[in-house]
Amino acid sequence: MEKIYTITQPILSDPLIGSNPRKLFHIPQDVLEWGGRICYRSTPKFRTSPDFIQKIISVEHLDVLEHGYAGFLMDVEEEYGVDSYYYFYHQMNQKYPYLRIDLHPTAKKIGIYGNFRAWHQLYENDFTQIWGMFGRKDMQELILTLSNLAPNVFPVPSWLVSQNENNSIGGEIRREHAMQMANQKGFNCRVTSSGANVMLLGKTNAINGTDRYHATFQFNGISRALSHQLVRHRVLSFSQESQRYVDGTNFQYVLPNVDNESKQEIKSTISFINEVYRNMRNRKVKKEDARCILPNAAVTQIVVSGEEFGWRHFIEQRTASDAQPEIREVALIVQDMLGDKNGSNLS
């Protein structure tokens, strides 16, 4: 089995802790926890609870799994003949629509790749049902690789542990990823004119010699007006700070570029909204009910992941000259960070 590509190690400045760069992510599983904690504004507790990911999975908050990604080229067992490649290709496509399946009949391989949520569906339901399609050693390596990337999402089955106590496959994979993690430098963060942070948390290497990739961003300090537009790009994956769980008292906001009189009216209105929200919370109104009055100008943070076609669509749509200025500025930064020159509206 050949791994199609490896996962880049992200390094991040935590906006809630300080401005100094810190190596927060040791393995891709850490990106999942970070995305989950963004929802609850609990990033200061990052990596303090070993079972955080298990809790997320147990309550089926599975969107955070979509921030992890893995891909493999698998050898199909030759005993099934040439037609087996097409058979397995169609079987996998029908059963696992959220995994991306590529057919490489000349190389006698099938490419399987997708986010950790798609892999988790396969892992939880019926890994054994595809066991016979591929070589036993390949399947063992696939399971061990996924486990090394996200051990709390893909725990190694007990039967495989006993079979591989002295097996070098897992050790080699672990050392390979550890070397890649140690070789990364710095983090990539840009600040918009309104003070929002655009952070590239991670990006895969090119997939099998193509221009395909998977990337994860965090947008911090953007308005809800921007995030409402962002989530329209449904092919991407999102984990957003929750107004249901995060208290909105004295919320910050983003002012649009309007005339001074309008700005003063906006500020006065937001001051009134803040007072009403605070009064409701003092009367023990739940956050999930009090949030009904929070405006689109309220600041939020969101983690966004996706493959190259999702990011390109976002770039093409949101860098257009008639795009809303706040999201256009973010999209232009994303385009530059990704080095994606295929967007139709370069600045």
Where are these regions (language model features)?
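Family-specific signature for flavin-dependent thymidylate synthase
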Residues: 1-347
